[in-house]
């Protein structure tokens, strides 16, 4: 498998072409993440774990100690075994690697769920979702819907955390180059 681009590299390039070039050709000059950036990553992981509870009884593709090819193979194995929800489902098409936060499969159609820890849907998230759609469509999957799940900034927690109120989904079912 010869990867040319990942989802994160694609969105990095959309945000800053110089950053993409440096990431590919001169990694040593990039500033490593500071504690603030690490906290943002950790917050994203927490929100992602909460979002998985909206799609119970799923299986997770492990990140540690596996190659991307292992992740792709395991994803296909889980699909073949009939799992309805797969967390971090991994695919490659046309040299592009993607990991879908939550892949939901119903009636031979797939729903992509991209989880973000922000309170609104930014354009870069739509590009992120678009490349996931491109890859799955290219692999022959029938993509029913793409969702960007994010924090509801109007949510006020009561005694118990209500994940269905904390997280909102913005749904995109019309596809062009960019989901609109």
Describe the role of every protein-language-model region:
Residues 91-179:
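Nucleic-acid nuclease catalytic cores
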Residues 1-109:
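Metal-dependent nuclease catalytic cores that hydrolyze phosphodiester bonds in DNA/RNA
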